[in-house]
């Protein structure tokens, strides 16, 4: 029979890779929790309405969601991103009424898009979200968390931070109209995708990967010419904090995020080492989303890290240094010695519970087992012998 393979764009993570993933996830978790953030968990499947209500015109909703009807006929979707689900969970569990929670979560997301280096149909994110705070200080905290993380992983010097301010709703409406008026003059040069974005959410055209469209946009109006004084002051205060902390940045007036709910601060950490998939972390404010999803008005901000891309970069730069946690490797040459070895291993763990012990029960040749013991990285390899006919037959009696 033919073997069954994984779905295209959905990848297995084998044991050696899991060690790398666990290392990276633990580093991120330790940094985030050192700032008082707490873990939250919520389902990977939600009502489709959760995503259509929060991102009606976004590509992930119009083209990329895994959506189907369950047996009751209700439309449900695999989560394409985590923020909407986190907001829903915070509202459902009444986390926002008396507190200003700082939360983190990690797990798989799903988007039906063309698989390529650094981009899969099932991918993983580590995210942090903050609710109830509307000052530039909390925006700065999230950026400082990410900067500290990059330093701990040894890649800070190779990354660049880009920041923009999308203003309030009126700013985005005025700017969108100006953008449409400008781009309409180039309608014959716009591709089908650009025309769709121009109709549904003009700001999204700024994120186009088309060189021809980016050339046109060089002369397009900038959103900073439409933001009000409050937004300008907000961004100035944020940048002042980053200057004080020595975190370099570039203000990119064309930076937008791929989801519709962002306002005011948006930011990305990028690298030049991964080709077109250059964004490692993206985040921003979404002050209207809680109310849009049925909660009371509540400011919020968050970021997400693409774990596949981060681990790809760390391996490329040889920044993952794994140490084995195996203390003892038992080598056995017969069923009798194997039995004695597993009993001995259990007694050792009874005495010292923290011991990590692996027993080879394959009964391979001596050479093969010694090679495996060496490859395991164990601190000690123990040869388990009994004077039996089996051992004598092996020439070890």
What do the PLM-derived regions correspond to, one by one?
Residues 1-389:
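TRNA-recognition modules of translation machinery and tRNA-sensing kinases, especially anticodon-binding
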Residues 387-397:
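Single conserved hydrophobic/aromatic residue that forms the stacking wall/gate
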């Amino acid at each position: 029979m033919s073997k069954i393979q994984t779905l295209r764009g959905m990848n297995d993570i084998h044991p050696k890779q899991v060690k790398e993933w666990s290392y990276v996830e633990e580093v991120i978790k330790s940094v985030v929790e050192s700032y008082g953030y707490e873990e939250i968990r919520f389902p990977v499947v939600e009502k489709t309405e959760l995503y259509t209500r929060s991102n009606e015109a976004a590509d992930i909703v119009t083209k990329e969601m895994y959506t189907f009807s369950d047996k009751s006929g209700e439309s449900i979707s695999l989560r394409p991103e985590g923020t909407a689900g986190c907001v829903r969970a915070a509202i459902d569990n009444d986390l926002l009424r008396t507190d200003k929670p700082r939360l983190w979560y990690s797990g798989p997301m799903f988007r039906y898009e063309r698989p390529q280096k650094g981009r899969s149909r099932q991918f993983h994110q580590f995210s942090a979200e903050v609710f109830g705070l509307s000052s530039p200080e909390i925006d700065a905290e999230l950026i400082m968390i990410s900067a500290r993380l990059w330093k701990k992983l040894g890649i800070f010097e190779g990354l660049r931070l880009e920041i923009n301010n999308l203003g309030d709703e009126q700013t985005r409406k005025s700017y969108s109209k100006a953008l449409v008026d400008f781009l309409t003059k180039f309608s014959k040069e716009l591709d089908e995708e650009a025309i769709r974005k121009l109709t549904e959410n003009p700001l999204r055209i700024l994120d186009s990967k088309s060189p021809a469209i980016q050339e046109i946009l060089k002369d397009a109006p900038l959103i900073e010419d439409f933001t009000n004084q409050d937004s300008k002051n907000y961004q100035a205060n944020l940048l002042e904090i980053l200057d004080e902390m020595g975190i370099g940045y570039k203000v990119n007036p064309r930076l937008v995020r791929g989801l519709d709910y962002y306002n005011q601060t948006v930011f990305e950490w990028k690298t030049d080492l991964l080709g077109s998939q250059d964004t490692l972390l993206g985040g921003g404010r979404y002050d209207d989303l809680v109310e849009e999803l049925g909660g009371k008005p509540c400011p919020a901000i968050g970021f997400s890290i693409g774990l596949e891309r981060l681990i790809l970069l760390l391996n490329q730069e040889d920044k993952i240094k794994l140490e084995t946690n195996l203390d003892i490797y038992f080598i056995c040459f017969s069923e009798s010695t194997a039995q004695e070895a597993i009993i001995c291993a259990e007694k050792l763990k009874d005495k010292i519970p923290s011991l990590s012990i692996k027993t080879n029960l394959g009964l391979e040749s001596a050479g093969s087992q010694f090679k495996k013991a060496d490859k395991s990285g164990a601190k000690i390899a123990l040869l388990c012998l009994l004077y039996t006919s089996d051992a004598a037959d092996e020439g070890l009696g």
